[in-house]
């Protein structure tokens, strides 16, 4: 009987393991993420909760009889909704994923073998139940190995960057990094041969790849977006990508799940200033204003503001001012704080304000960030689906409030994530604001369903709940027409419940 239970658990581990490996890959191989998502999935909806209860009953019963242990592999038909293939993010069998899969499989087999040796149905069942944690253990064990394997590409990138002689502009922030990078690269391209890191290539291996593949001979400025999930990451990046100019765009409750506080976010991101000649800091947030004052005692700081605050570069309404003097009118629908930082970067690199102002026309726009278009059916579409944050979501609602031709207004959203303990409150507040502007709210998925329903419940907007973005898009197509407008606010990948 023990052998049969072990065989059943091994067989059940294959589809279950593929599901959780996909989560690991989508979460950038961060140890601990798989178990976190397992907790979310097994408590999402009555069916998954029922399957979780079945597994727990099987584990408890297996203390007395191995027969009870068979409930654990049977329950691996769940969690319902998390597929092996994926809709938006299919499993990609990269070399790194294969290494994780092999090590996780070896750990799981060792646990099952231990259960057989001890003749313990519980020990075998707990191995399958804790499969997400075993994958996290494999990720943790392989972390140093992956880092050493990546050193070759990092060393090559560092040598290539040094040989180019290019000046480095490094940009970080809780949000707005990519848009600021695009603005800065556009403004600088009028005077320098400029290369910017593509898309959201903002970590160690992404930036190494960007430099190795895109930094051509003759490049004069390299604009690097730098992200972080914790202290020390940006410090390590600046060791081999030393910035001449370092910019901090914005601070907000993004990735609070990992950082725990905005003060810790500032401390981690402020590492970008340590090796820079000039720092450009958007001082609209009190923590960044305090940082600018503190760092200004030891290095040159260019203060900027997108909200008309006291700073060297400020955008007040639509007026761009430098050192208190009006210099130009900002283009419509521009992200003001991001533009202020980009102008500050140009000034820090020695460009004249006239050179920068002459490049304002044609500022690029990052994809899926408050992009306004018109559908074939004649309704207005606002696409703000990339990495939603509270400030950006409020701004997107302002866009929805301004557009449309008198028809219905709809908000489609799964809510915001990685906001730590403030996540429920921020989503309730967003739903409340959305209900005040929109006629209809379409809630996607289960991650923030309860908070969004609570936030919208006291207002006049009607609510529809759907399981996936595809269902939400179908609803919009069936219900909206000419004169209507829809805001798509955030789009969670389908490894979220």
Regions picked out by a protein language model, each given a short descriptive name:
Residues 248-380, 405-407, 432-440, 446-463:
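Acidic, Mg2+-coordinating active-site environments of NTP-dependent enzymes
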Residues 179, 202-205, 232, 337, ...:
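Residues that form or flank phosphate/diphosphate-binding pockets in enzymes
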Residues 172-175, 198-199, 226-227, 250-251, ...:
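Fold-independent oxyanion-binding glycine-rich loops
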Residues 1-144, 347-354, 358-368, 372-497:
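ATP-dependent carboxylate-amine ligase
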Residues 184, 188, 207-211, 339-349, ...:
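Buried hydrophobic packing segments
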Residues 202-203, 306-313, 468-474:
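A short acidic, often aromatic-flanked loop/helix-cap motif at beta-alpha or helix-coil junctions
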Residues 3-283, 287-297:
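Phosphate-binding loop of NTP-binding sites
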Residues 202, 229-232, 260, 334-337, ...:
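Charged, alpha-helix-enriched surfaces in structured cytosolic catalytic cores
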